[in-house]
Amino acid sequence: MKTLLTTTLLLLTLSFYAQDAKEIIRKAEEKMRGKESAYTEMTIEVIRPKWTRTMGLKSWSRGNDYSLMVLTEPAKDAGTAFLKRHKEVWNWVPSIERSIKMPPSMMMQSWMGTDMSNDDLVRESSSVTDYTHALGKDSIIDGKKCWKVILTPKPDAAVVWGKVVAFVDQKDYVQLKAEQYDEDGYLVNEMLGSEVKEMDGVILATRLELIPIEKEGQKTIMTINTIKFNEVYDDAFFTVHNMKNIR
């Protein structure tokens, strides 16, 4: 009886911590998405040893199922758009006036020559629902005490990474660092969040650096210039037709 009680308490404790870890990730994601929706304007810098390229991006999102993004610069790429509706992802290329439905196999490919994958951009996979979550040892990042949350893909989840380790500020639920590992356990990328400030009533990291570990002198920097939360967008906004006309 005593052994059964001990086992039950252990299972309940493990369940509590797993739920707690999942809730931490959910709250951290809400910082970028809003509870309902978000509109964002950002600058993206692609840095390479011998050159640098800058892009402008506008994005609209509603929950985890709907998002629409359009490039605003450089001029040659302006109007290029990406749409996510549930598990469907579309790309509009204005130079050839063609919309392309992107298959799951394209999610791992680089987005527009950056260090981000297509999945990073449209977030076809969800760090909340497609992974299991466990708490590791607390860490200090940029002088702030952070939870260390280990995300492991669920067996049937169509995700890019074999494991993700996220470090979330315990005060404001801001993700200050993330490590992305491949299926063999090798560290591929680091994501660093900085320049934490309040925007539209929410404290968040406004500068995100994605750094490939084995590519010296290479990284992608995303800077949030404007963000508005909980705007109203209906289903008709997130359509292939609107993707072709959004600016």
Regions found by a protein language model. Give the residues of each.
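Positively charged n-region of N-terminal signal peptides that target proteins for export
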Residues: 1-7
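Residue-level signal for tight coil/turn positions that link beta-strands
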Residues: 63-64, 86-87, 200
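N-terminal, post-signal-peptide region of Sec/Tat-exported proteins
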Residues: 42-76
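Short, exposed beta-strand/loop patches in secreted or surface proteins that constitute
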Residues: 57-61, 81-82, 136-138, 194-196
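Hydrophobic h-region of N-terminal signal peptides that target proteins for export
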Residues: 9-18
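Flexible, processing/modification-adjacent segments and terminal tails
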Residues: 19-37, 43-46, 52-53, 78-81, ...
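Gly/Pro-enriched, hydrophobic low-complexity segments
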Residues: 18, 122, 142-239
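Short hydrophobic/aromatic-rich beta-strand segments that constitute the beta-sheet cores
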Residues: 40, 67-71, 89-93, 99-101, ...
